[in-house]
C-alpha cells in the first residue's frame, strides 16, 4: 500500500529533503501495517508479555522449561495463500521455521490453523488442496513434523482463506542466540539468491484483495525447502561453535526491515553495499532492498569469527555475502555500485508513525445479540447434521498428508488427542503439549468474549493432555483498520485477550496481526478471528492423555452446562444461523476445573480426556466413543439448561469429558466434582432423557469420518 500524504510529509520534514526511489521503497515496506504495526501497536501494549518463565519475546517467544528453552511462534500468510495457495502456504511454513531458528532453537514441530470458505465452492476446494499440499511438501522435505492444527469452514472466508502456521523449537539453555551487536560487527546474508519474487510482499499484505489479483503474483515468494534444511543445519552448527551474535529472518520487508529493525533495537547504524549481495538476476537497488525472496537470513558475526563461519556455510553449500557492518551513527546507509542510494535514521525508519485510529461498534452488530425462538428439532437429525459438519468431522484427509513422525518426538499424534504431545529428548520423560485454536463465529458475534473463549479452549486442550499451560502466542486477523466499524473488532479482541491471559496467568508472549482481510469484489470482510497457540509442560509423556475410551468405560462430565447456543455449531448446522452471544468466558472457573483435571489424570483408571467445545456434548461423546458407541443420559448433565438441545449442543467452557474405568469412578468423582453422564459401548450413539430414548444415531462414526472428506474429494 503506498505511503499516505501525511506519511510522505512526515518523511520529508524529518529528512529535510525528498526521499529517493530506494528510500521510498524502504519506507513503503517498513511502514506497511505488516511490518510496522502502526495501527495495532497502541493496543498490543495491553498484552502481558512477561512472566518469570518467559525469557525472550520478539521474532520467537522463548519459555524456560527448566532444563531447556522452548521457542514458539505463529504467523499468517493469508494474502499470498488466497492468490497462490500452494506457494503461499509453503513459504509461510518456511518463514515461521526461520523465526524459530533465529533464536538458536532447533525447529521440532509445526501446527497449522486454517480457515476456509464454503466447502461446496470449487474455489474453496482449490484453496484447501493447495494449502494442505504446500504445508505438507515443505514441512516433509525440511524434516519438521506437522503434529496438530485446527481447520474451520465458513462462507465469509470463500475468497479470503486464513492460513497460519505455528512452529515450536528447542534450544539448550547455554546456546540461545541473543547477543548484542556492536559497531564493527559484520552483516552476512546467508541462504538463497535474491530475486524479484516477493517484491513488496509486505505492502501486498497491507491492502485488500482486488479483482484481477493475478497481477500480484510477483508478490508471492518461491519456496525452496532444501535450502531451508541447509540453513537449519548450518545455523545450528554455527550456534554450537558460538559464532553468531544475532540472527534475523529476512521476511516481510526484506533487507529494509531486517537492517533497520536490528540497528534501531540496539541503538546502532548500518553501512552496507547492496551490490555485494548474491543475486539470482539483474536487479535495481530498490528491488534488492525490498525483495522478500525466501530462505534468507541475516547473520551478525564478529570480524574475528568470520572465517570460521564461512567454512561452516561452505560445508553446507549455503550461499552467503558479507554486505556490510554495524556502525555507531544510528543511520542506515546503503551503497550500490559505489553510489550512496539511501541514508536514513534507523529508528525513524524502523518504528514509523503510531496511529490512534478511531473505532466504534457497527450498528448492525447489535441486532445479532438477539437469538430468535428456535423450533423444536428431531435430536437424531440434529446430531447427524452437527457431526457431519466439516467443522466437527475428522480432518484425517488433511493430517494424513503430513509427516508427523520425523524426529521421533511425537507422542500424541494428530487425531489422537486435544493437544499434540512431544518428547523432550533433552530431558526425558518430560514433554511439551501444544494446541492451536480459533473460532471465527465467536469473535464475530462478540470479539471480546470470543477472543477469551478461543484462548480458554486452547487452555483446555493443553490441560486435557495432562500438561500445565505456560504461555501462548496469538494471530489476529481482521479487516481494514481504516474503517472504525471494522477496527472495533480488532480492538475488542485484544481487550479480551489482555483480560483472559491475566485471569489464568498464561501470558501471550508474541504474535502477529493481519489486517485488510477483505476484498473489493464483494466489499465484505472476513469474520474477525483470533488464533491461539498454547504450550504446556508435561512432566511425564508416558502419562499424557488422549481423547479415547474403551468398552465399558463410564463417561464423567466435569463442569456445568449452561444454555449457551449463541454462535454454536448446532445453530449453524441445524438452523443456518450465526447469532446470539458466544459462551460466557469464565476464566476463574476454568483455572479451578483445570486443577481438578490435572489431579484426576493421575488417577489410575482414567482412559481418556476430551474437552467439550465445538459441537457441544454430543460431539465430545461421539469423538470419545468412536469404535464402541455410547449411551448419554441428559438428565445427569449438571447445569441450568432447560431444553435437551441445550444440554446436547451448548458450547459452554470449563467442561471436560473423561472416560473412566468403573472401579476408578468414585475417586475421579471425588477429585473432580463431576457426574457420570453415560457409558461407552453398545454400538450406536444413544441419548436418553429421564430414562427415555430421545435419539439414536447408528452411523455416527461414518458421519465423523467422512463429513469433511466427502465434500472435498
UniProtKB/Swiss-Prot annotation:
Key words of the record: ATP-binding, Cytoplasm, Ligase, Magnesium, Metal-binding, Nucleotide-binding, Purine biosynthesis
GO BP annotations, alphabetical order: 'de novo' IMP biosynthetic process
Gene3D superfamilies referenced in this protein's UniProt entry, alphabetically: PurM-like C-terminal domain, PurM-like, N-terminal domain
UniProt-listed InterPro entries: PRibForGlyAmidine_synth_PurL (IPR010074), PurL_linker (IPR041609), PurM-like_C_dom (IPR010918), PurM-like_C_sf (IPR036676), PurM-like_N (IPR016188), PurM-like_N_sf (IPR036921)
Compartmental location: Cytoplasm
Enzyme class: ligase
CDD domains per the UniProt record, alphabetical: PurL_repeat1 (cd02203), PurL_repeat2 (cd02204)
Residues engaged in binding Mg(2+) 2: 99, 249
Record-listed substrate binding positions: 76-79, 98, 221, 292-294, 514
Superkingdom to which the source organism belongs: Archaea
EC number: 6.3.5.3
SUPFAM superfamilies (alphabetical): PurM C-terminal domain-like, PurM N-terminal domain-like
Functional summary from the UniProt entry: Part of the phosphoribosylformylglycinamidine synthase complex involved in the purines biosynthetic pathway. Catalyzes the ATP-dependent conversion of formylglycinamide ribonucleotide (FGAR) and glutamine to yield formylglycinamidine ribonucleotide (FGAM) and glutamate. The FGAM synthase complex is composed of three subunits. PurQ produces an ammonia molecule by converting glutamine to glutamate. PurL transfers the ammonia molecule to FGAR to form FGAM in an ATP-dependent manner.
Family classification: Belongs to the FGAMS family.
Name of this protein: Phosphoribosylformylglycinamidine synthase subunit PurL
Organism in which the protein naturally occurs: Ignicoccus hospitalis (strain KIN4/I / DSM 18386 / JCM 14125)
